[in-house]
Amino acid sequence: MGSDKRVSRTERSGRYGSIIDRDDRDERESRSRRRDSDYKRSSDDRRGDRYDDYRDYDSPERERERRNSDRSEDGYHSDGDYGEHDYRHDISDERESKTIMLRGLPITITESDIREMMESFEGPQPADVRLMKRKTGVSRGFAFVEFYHLQDATSWMEANQKKLVIQGKHIAMHYSNPRPKFEDWLCNKCCLNNFRKRLKCFRCGADKFDSEQEVPPGTTESVQSVDYYCDTIILRNIAPHTVVDSIMTALSPYASLAVNNIRLIKDKQTQQNRGFAFVQLSSAMDASQLLQILQSLHPPLKIDGKTIGVDFAKSARKDLVLPDGNRVSAFSVASTAIAAAQWSSTQSQSGEGGNVDYSYMQPGQDGYTQYTQYSQDYQQFYQQQTGGLESDASATSGTTVTTTSAAVVSQSPQLYNQTSNPPGSPTEEAQPSTSTSTQAPAASPTGVVPGTKYAVPDTSTYQYDESSGYYYDPTTGLYYDPNSQYYYNSLTQQYLYWDGEKETYVPAAESSSNQQAGLPSTKEGKEKKEKPKSKTAQQIAKDMERWAKSLNKQKENFKNSFQPVNSLREEERRESAAADAGFALFEKKGALAERQQLIPELVRNGDEENPLKRGLVAAYSGDSDNEEELVERLESEEEKLADWKKMACLLCRRQFPNRDALVRHQQLSDLHKQNMDIYRRSRLSEQELEALELREREMKYRDRAAERREKYGIPEPPEPKRKKQFDAGTVNYEQPTKDGIDHSNIGNKMLQAMGWREGSGLGRKCQGITAPIEAQVRLKGAGLGAKGSAYGLSGADSYKDAVRKAMFARFTEME
């Protein structure tokens, strides 16, 4: 019996006991299977949100890099990142990848510990190490190690036999493969892989149904298989205090770089590096060669003790996918023109030969023909411009600096200046058609022909240009101003408007002053008065020109107050960044001549007529309103009243020690303002003086009350009104005790019924009072125990009697 198992009260013995145990075991197994299936299903549904916390607690530099870059080879894209990878280990489905997953890590481990451990081994070094964390910042026990190449990852796995020992703990290593994306959908507009639950594109908001209908199958694979090429590479994992010189020193054995080829990104607040930098080379082929050299280095490139990751700097714009599987840059023809214009401006500024290498684009690829055509056109344009400049360099002494029309489409805030011929030079007149034909591909891909019917403008397709503040229409090459609703043609420098009836672009109304230049001045004045006051293209251009000049003048005054006089001319060659938008559209040749320093003799010869100024817009003929011409002429003459060499005000005959004092005198001095007013009026003709006085009267406040007082005099003040007094009406009320108390009252009758007789006192022995009790008034004191006074007051007393009694009581109290 010793071998028999003792059965408890809750356990059933006999033949039913084994059946129950078997049923319990089966139930536990089925429950575990259901739990596993539920876990897999929930993990599939939550795959996009499973590891969001690693992005929340990652470094801001790495977060910005992941947001701005797309990983096409391993399937990392901005909508999914590492959430697209399958973390469940299945040996049969495991495929080689350049990303390795480390599982079973200690909770206290950090990314730096993993990086130091991997750098201690010989062989290929990782490009990036990412530790997955929870929202609390605690490690989740696994991390991802990314290598530059697939061969590096496979050799690392073979060398370590898929096992590591970190902090005394055995770590398992597996290839991290992306999950199949058959349930995801690809946006047809921006080529972004979106989750299957999204009904609209995460980036551009395109409808899912349209993309599924238009995008052919197999497009995703074609996008992943095509490499990305550009002329800029990105350097990641840069130390916070690394400088540009350190980067140049590290890259000097492999490429010849200048300081302007490297851009180190820094934080605006801390002024420390944000962890990455950009290196721009002359062509995409040079960038590709440098990238291959840096990625093949063993050990990898290090700058200030940090292992640097190298890759192409991918643009924020995605690549479009054609049905045949080829990729075309998502930059429209407008963006191509912008790039070509920037190339032209930078070449003219640096003075080097304009050669652009488009060899990285394969012949036959879509877009190759356009880029080749733009390259040829702009090389020809640059050669013509440089040839004209060399021929005119010896003939012209004062060279003006203006911005070209190509700067209209500049995407960066930089100014691309080029020297041009002075107004009216033979070179300029001899080559108007050539410059127009060469600029046509850059500014407008199609051009606008007057009289040709076009489709109705679609403002949703316009692209905003930050440098000019206008919207660019890629179909017509025009710039749209939403405020005035005019279109600007950068080729002809003319304003247009859309005519819905004719379905074409019609030039804005231009003045006819050029046709009637030979008529007498009186007739011109009448025509100007009869001209309607509508805002034409000339007036719009004039307003923007005046606005740009005012901004430039303010900025030049501020800059010149801190600089010597000899650097003034060099400073004036630089355009103001605040007025870049106005000058990029409306500045033409000869704009700087108005701001050149003038000697005092020009003030004495100011009676001579000024030469006609060349308009900033080709369509502007100089025929503007009288007020605008008056203001402009006065402003040009006022600039001659200051000698900036001697620091003297010629109008007030005052000399100052520095430029700042002279500027303050012009802006704040009452004497200068009075003299300027007198000078302005002396320079005006009778008609202009009348117009100015009329304008001042309209702008001045008219005190009509003062005019009335001056005409009719001040009237006498009215007599003050007296207050009306109303006598209160007398009210008859009952006064039974006015004449004394008689025997007819109720109290007297009650006392007589009890045996009381008139004249006797109250009480059993008639010892009480014989007269009735009179009402008395007691004056209020200051508190308890204060001495007060009382005086008799009857209801029949008048106000005068009551006052007399109170006064008498006070008098007796004083005694």
UniProtKB/Swiss-Prot annotation:
Ranges where the G-patch domain occurs: 743-789
Location of the region described as Disordered in the Swiss-Prot/TrEMBL record: 1-93, 407-468, 508-540
GO annotations of cellular component type: cytosol; nucleoplasm; nucleus; spliceosomal complex
Keyword vocabulary terms for this entry: Apoptosis, Metal-binding, mRNA processing, mRNA splicing, Nucleus, Phosphoprotein, Repeat, RNA-binding, Spliceosome, Zinc, Zinc-finger
Primary location group: nucleus
CDD domains named in the record: OCRE_RBM5 (cd16168), RRM1_RBM5 (cd12752), RRM2_RBM5 (cd12755)
Residues covered by region (Sufficient for interaction with ACIN1, PRPF8, SFRS3, SNRPB, SNRPN, SNRNP70 and SNRNP200): 452-535
Domain of life assignment: Eukaryota
ZnF (RanBP2-type) ranges: 181-210
Segments of skewed composition (Polar residues): 411-422, 510-519
Stretches with biased composition (Low complexity): 426-446
ZnF region ranges: C2H2-type: 647-672
RRM domain boundaries: 98-178, 231-315
Assembly mode: Component of the spliceosome A complex (also known as the prespliceosome). Appears to dissociate from the spliceosome upon formation of the spliceosome B complex (also known as the precatalytic spliceosome), in which the heterotrimeric U4/U6.U5 snRNPs are bound. Interacts with U2AF2; this interaction is direct. Also interacts with ACIN1, PRPF8, SFRS3, SNRPB, SNRPN, SNRNP70 and SNRNP200; these interactions may be indirect.
Family indicated by similarity: Belongs to the RBM5/RBM10 family.
Protein name: RNA-binding protein 5
Source species: Rattus norvegicus
Lineage, opening ranks: Eukaryota, Metazoa, Chordata, Craniata, Vertebrata
Primary gene name: Rbm5
